């Protein structure tokens, strides 16, 4: 691997969102509202590293990846999307394709807000997933 593993994980999650979950992805971060049931974007990644003793350049990595899910149509679709994201686990074939040794994926936090300051209003939920994996640099 010649780049940060988190980029491969981000791209795998993007594929899972569109190909497996069938959700719209706001990949360019350009949409401000959505006419679809739910649109997802990845808004932040935060990572920590712990050296593995005796393994040279091995690191135990803990990646928090934050998703936003929004819709102007309804809260049910937004919450279903959050639920589906939480259900993604380390045995997902697309994550295995990355070649990254993922040890665990767990939800860390989630919240929902109802915005009424736009003409249509919308619901937005956030979800943070923690991905523990082994990396080599």
Enumerate the language-model features and the residues they cover.
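Low-complexity, acidic Ser/Thr/Pro/Gly-rich terminal tails and inter-domain linkers that flank the onset
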Residues: 38-46
């Amino acid at each position: 691997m010649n780049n940060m593993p988190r980029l491969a994980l981000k791209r795998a999650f993007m594929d899972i969102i569109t190909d497996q979950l069938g959700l719209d992805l706001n990949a360019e971060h350009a949409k401000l509202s959505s006419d679809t049931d739910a649109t997802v974007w990845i808004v932040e990644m935060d990572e920590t590293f712990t050296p593995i003793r005796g393994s040279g350049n091995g690191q135990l990595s803990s990646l928090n990846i934050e998703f936003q899910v929004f819709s102007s149509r309804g809260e049910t679709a937004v919450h279903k999307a959050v639920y589906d994201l939480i259900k993604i686990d380390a045995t997902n074939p697309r994550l295995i394709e990355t070649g990254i040794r993922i040890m665990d994926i767990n939800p860390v936090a989630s919240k929902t807000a109802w915005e009424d300051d736009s003409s249509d209003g919308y619901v937005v939920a956030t979800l943070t997933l923690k991905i523990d994996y082994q990396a080599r640099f």
